[in-house]
């Protein structure tokens, strides 16, 4: 695929500077280290460094031209003969639009659904992918764990990729035959305009609870970042194309803003039941084997049977079905396909030992819960697995929102019978100080152990748990690394739990 530079600029409404050459472009890149001949360098401002300031290096490496912002131009002023286009603020929005235009607007060539919220994004996107494929739609998934579409699958490096890579992935998925795509859209991606240039056919708001306040500074700013997904130019205007969880106060606020352009989803019952919810569930029966019930929608209602655990997964199910109904998929086939979805790695995942007698060891669950709301949901979902004791192993990440540390500790103390506080990803913070911040939220009288070494903490919890107890290891889920300082070292909660279970059986 090639495009002429002048045509590309005009396609997004940018003027062509006088005297600018008009080379043929074969690629676009935001990384000056990966440019080659035929490349348009897109200088993206970053949190620490303005990528546009590397335009000279990009041109020296073979880039045909560079697009930069006013700040980069002030740092490294281009001369009249340089192949540089200076765009106005917001630079990131122009970068996204240029990348989308280069790849011929891939998001407009299939039905792209965006999912945002503090918790539930990964499970909901995987559910949407599973259900869509089950009813015969060729589907692409872009998310925290993996990016995949027909005949292609690669582990993801970001929840939402940067614009140059994201638009290339969308184009590849469309060329591979994907008819529908589903994307996790983080608040960082929305605030940094990584999805600028995307056109979403549908959107889901899962919930909003405290997280990332080190970045957004306030819940109001966090909410407004998420809300960008539900308005033009990202979400197509017209009939209802969004599904919003109104059991979340922030979701109720968003739904009020959207009016008839969204379907409201709710699990509230009795006097709390949301009469105006288009999507709801009734006659629910939950057990350690999963959940059964009736799903009600504007397209009809029917029975479903799911092996997923926890009430929070019911909202994930409800919203996944709802947004696919908005895209015209049939309710009976969607309900049938729910039974075959076994979950997502690192989300309430049970650690099992082959050939082991389950009655001789505790039940061990690994979950990604790393926010107050997420930890509360995971603990409540774990409780039905035991009539005995529930142990919670968790920590809090360094260099991140400190306000949630004591909140998570209080939740663990309230809902678990025993708490083991340990390290998560300490990053550049003192691990002992993080532990002190967490322990400050644990009431006196709580059975609590503090162990800075996460592997030792997991082993200790499993060794001391009785058969029939449940040990919930929370915080890292699918992650196979731990961030110590500025380095990543291999670490997997599931591997450590399996090792501890084997050691227990071996005596």
From Swiss-Prot:
Its cofactor is Mg(2+). GO terms for molecular function: ATP binding; magnesium ion binding; UDP-N-acetylmuramoylalanyl-D-glutamate-2,6-diaminopimelate ligase activity. Meso-2,6-diaminopimelate binds at residues 400, 424-427, 475, 479. It is an enzyme of class 6 (ligase). Its EC number is 6.3.2.13. UDP-N-acetyl-alpha-D-muramoyl-L-alanyl-D-glutamate binds at residues 32, 159-160, 186, 192, 194. The modification N6-carboxylysine is found at residue 226. A motif (Meso-diaminopimelate recognition motif) lies at residues 424-427. Belongs to the MurCDEF family. MurE subfamily. Catalyzes the addition of meso-diaminopimelic acid to the nucleotide precursor UDP-N-acetylmuramoyl-L-alanyl-D-glutamate (UMAG) in the biosynthesis of bacterial cell-wall peptidoglycan. This is UDP-N-acetylmuramoyl-L-alanyl-D-glutamate--2,6-diaminopimelate ligase. The gene is murE.
